């Protein structure tokens, strides 16, 4: 547990400068008491419109460093706006039967689980409604997120997969959508947010759909079935809060007037669901807690990876999921690995050691 908390506390420090003074002053408890305190803080917010509200928000909440739409399902290159207005890729009801043609609005927490468009304000809550590839969104449908351990029936442009879930204690033959590693923490924190912001409603959603029933446990405090909560906590630790999420949190706050506490304070997840956190294998997080990447963003085409771990493999992956550079058995000096002559852009660094891996987001200016 010490190493998990170290990771989460380090991640939390990224966003402190952006959190309004005193915003979490009433969040003083632990366990479900803390969750209810957070519920009371974030439940009241401005419900924005489905259209044009969400479309307009995405210009500031989901913009990549290159100015394109940030799509977590495919990382396809999408231009903001409609084709008629800007030559963009926003969905207008045409195209999208193939990947990388159109982006639309994805309820990462499926809307059918809470009753569809009648579920207000959940239906337009930007913290979980994100821009994604229209084709991939349609294929995911109402599937829960999960781990596809065997053969996948479909793989997206950035490596997300659809197939039978192999996470521990999963319902038999459950078909799930597994996001790319670099976005697993993002969706996990969406689910913690939904469990908290809608604490007064979520217990009643369990039996609305079969897929929702596989994930929800019918309570307002624990909220999720153990298999799903354990998976979300694992992803929360393996893919720490990034600058992308911090920027998105601030952009949504500017419009909705509330925040995602688990982006501002990642440590809250284990303070609330402490029993589930304690059940996790802390060895799997040792690599994550012991890595420092700097400078990030980098202005000199160079990044340093400082860690006490002996890395087996370093992969530099672009936003389309392509491996741009791979170093097997890299050498370190004073526990520091250095990558040089990196081209400008946004990348993912996948670091592996002793069958463990972690993906970090980096920007080269």
Indicate residue ranges for each PLM-predicted region.
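C-terminal tail/sorting-segment detector
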Residues: 3, 346-365
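Short, glycine-anchored, charge-dense loop/turn motifs used at functional sites
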Residues: 316-324, 347
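Domain-level detector of nuclease and nuclease-like folds
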Residues: 95-104, 111-279
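Sec-dependent N-terminal signal peptides
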Residues: 4-13
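Short, surface-exposed loop/turn motifs with a glycine/proline- and acidic-biased composition
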Residues: 328-354
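Short coil/turn motif common to extracellular beta-sandwich-like domains
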Residues: 296-304
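N-terminal module-boundary/linker segments of secreted carbohydrate-active enzymes
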Residues: 18-79
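Residue-level detector of functionally pivotal "anchor" positions at catalytic/ligand-binding pockets or at interdomain
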Residues: 275-294, 307
């Amino acid at each position: 547990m010490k190493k998990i908390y170290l990771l989460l506390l380090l991640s939390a420090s990224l966003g402190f400068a952006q959190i309004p003074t005193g915003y979490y002053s009433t969040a003083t408890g632990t366990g479900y008491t803390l969750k209810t305190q957070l519920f009371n803080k974030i439940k009241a917010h401005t419900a924005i419109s489905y259209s044009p509200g969400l479309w307009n928000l995405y210009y500031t909440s989901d913009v990549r460093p290159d100015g394109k739409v940030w799509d977590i399902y495919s990382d396809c290159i999408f231009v903001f706006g409609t084709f008629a207005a800007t030559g963009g890729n926003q969905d207008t009801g045409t195209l999208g039967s193939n990947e990388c043609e159109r982006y639309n609005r994805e309820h990462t927490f499926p809307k059918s689980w809470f009753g569809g468009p009648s579920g207000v304000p959940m239906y337009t809550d930007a913290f979980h409604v994100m821009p994604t590839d229209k084709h991939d969104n349609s294929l995911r449908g109402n599937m829960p997120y999960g781990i596809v351990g065997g053969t996948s029936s479909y793989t997206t442009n950035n490596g997300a997969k659809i197939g039978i879930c192999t996470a521990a204690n999963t319902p038999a033959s459950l078909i799930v959508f597994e996001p790319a590693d670099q976005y697993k923490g993002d969706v996990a924190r969406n689910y913690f947010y939904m469990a908290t912001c809608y604490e007064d409603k979520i217990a009643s959603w369990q039996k609305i759909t079969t897929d929702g029933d596989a994930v929800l446990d019918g309570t307002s405090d624990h909220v999720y079935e153990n298999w799903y909560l354990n998976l979300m906590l694992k992803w929360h630790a393996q893919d720490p809060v990034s600058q992308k999420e911090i920027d998105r949190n601030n952009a949504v706050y500017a419009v909705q007037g509330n925040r995602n506490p688990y982006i501002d304070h990642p440590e809250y997840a284990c303070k609330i669901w402490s029993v589930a956190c304690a059940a996790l294998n802390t060895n799997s997080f040792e690599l994550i807690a012991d890595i420092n990447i700097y400078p990030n963003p980098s202005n000199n085409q160079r990044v340093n990876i400082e860690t006490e771990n002996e890395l087996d493999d370093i992969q530099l992956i672009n936003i389309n999921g392509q491996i741009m550079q791979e170093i097997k058995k890299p050498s370190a000096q004073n526990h520091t690995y250095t990558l040089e002559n990196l081209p400008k852009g946004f990348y993912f660094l996948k670091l592996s050691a002793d069958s463990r891996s972690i993906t970090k987001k980096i920007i080269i200016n």
